[in-house]
Each structure stands twice: as structure tokens, then as C-alpha cells.
Amino acid sequence: MLHSPVFPAFGHHLAQHPAMPLAMELPRTPKASFNIDSILSRTDRPASKLSMEMPSWQPPSPPSMPYRYSYGMMPYPPVWLIKPTVGYPNMAQQQPMRMPRGECLCPDPTCKERVLPFSHCPNGAMNPLSWRTGPCKMKRIRTVFTPEQLEKLEKEFLKQQYMVGTERVDLASTLNLTETQVKVWFQNRRIKWRKQSLEQKKAKLSQFGVIPADSSDHTDDSRETEEDEDDLDVEL
């Protein structure tokens, strides 16, 4: 028996408890077997318990799509050219094309009337975008002048058939009109004056029994003069 000079009772304590382990052992749980028979015969499956507590994630269902369209082939949302029919979301009803005043998107190089509102184009009823491929038909605007305005314009036309620059601006301001309205009035008045002059000339020649010459030259000259004018399709 061992005796410690420092702790005399230590040897006596060991003598009374010779089989006492130095460290306490914890109870061990039996190891689970992972062979096929043990897995199939198990009744307490923790996976099922976990699935009850935490349901598996499911992807959200795709949004409802109109009939006749598959996912990834959805049409573009309707713009102001197409208006869906009430009660039939899959049916489209064409609406007339309306452009802001002062704009014409006609790509035809011969179409110079770009200051008037867009009315419609040929074959526009078949395709809402067919106006991009053909010359557009411009909507005429009729400007109504008062008798005082017409009288003043006629007086100025007798003085000079062409009015440009500050004179036209001052006249438009005096008559409470726009410069474009005054410009178009003088343009149409010149065309009317040329036609009247040609008719008067033919009438005088017919009185003397003279057959008037072919007016093709005069027509060509008049056409060239009209082409030199600004092509503003506005009636007075």
C-alpha cells in the first residue's frame, strides 16, 4: 500500500475503493446498421417526421397564359395601335392610326407634306404597321378666314405676290394668324391667279377665232412653279 507523506488519507481512500474507475463512462447507444435489411425493416424513419415538420419546397406555378400561346411565345403587350376587345382578351380590334399634329412618318421620298397630321395609308386596314411601306394620305385642313383678314390679304397680294421675311411675320401678327397660314394663303392665291390668267387668255383668243396653242408648255411652267412652292396641302 502506498502512503503519501503529503496526503496521508489518500492511500486509505484507495484501499476502500479499489475497483472505482478513474473516469466515468457514459452509456453508449447501439450503432445503427445501414444494410438493406435494416433500412427496409425500420419503422421509425426520421425523414418522414422531418417532411411533416418542414414540407419540401415546390416551385411557384407559372402565371396563367392566354389560350393558344405557350410559355416563351407570349405576344408583345398591345400598344396604342391595337386595342383588345372587351370580353375577348385574345381577340384584337384595329384602331385608326393617329399621329400628333406636325408629324408624318411616311418614308416615301415623294411625300413632302410633313407638317400636317397623319390620316391613314393604303392597305392600313390589313396591317396596323403597313403605313411604313407606302405613301401616306394627308388630311386636308381648311383654314377659315374672317372677311377682314381676307380683305387685308387681298390688298397685300395686289401689291406683291410673294411675301417673305419680316413682312410676312408682321402681317401674320397684325391679322392674328400664324406665319404658316399667311404663307399657305399666298401660295394658294398664286396658284389660283395663274389658273385665272390662263383661262382669261384662252377666252380672249377664242373671241378672235384663234385656236389656242397647246397649253402643255404653260402647264409645265405652272407645274414647275408649283413644285418650287412649299408643298403644304392646306386649303383655304
UniProtKB/Swiss-Prot annotation:
InterPro entries named in the record: EMX-VAX-Noto_Homeobox_TFs (IPR050877), HD (IPR001356), HD_metazoa (IPR020479), Homeobox_CS (IPR017970), Homeodomain-like_sf (IPR009057), HTH_motif (IPR000047)
Alphabetized GO MF terms: DNA-binding transcription factor activity, RNA polymerase II-specific; RNA polymerase II cis-regulatory region sequence-specific DNA binding
Pfam families assigned: Homeodomain (PF00046)
Residue ranges of DNA binding: 138-197
Biased composition (Acidic residues): 223-236
Keyword DNA-binding: yes
Tissue: Expressed throughout the embryo during pre-gastrula stages. Localized to the dorsal lip of the blastopore (Spemann organizer) during early gastrulation, after which expression continues in tissues derived from the organizer. Expressed in the notochord during mid-gastrulation. During neurulation, expressed in the notochord, archenteron roof and the prospective floor plate. Also expressed in the region that will become the epiphysis, the pineal body precursor.
Any single Gene Ontology cellular-component annotation: nucleus
Protein name: Homeobox protein notochord
Organism, as annotated: Xenopus laevis
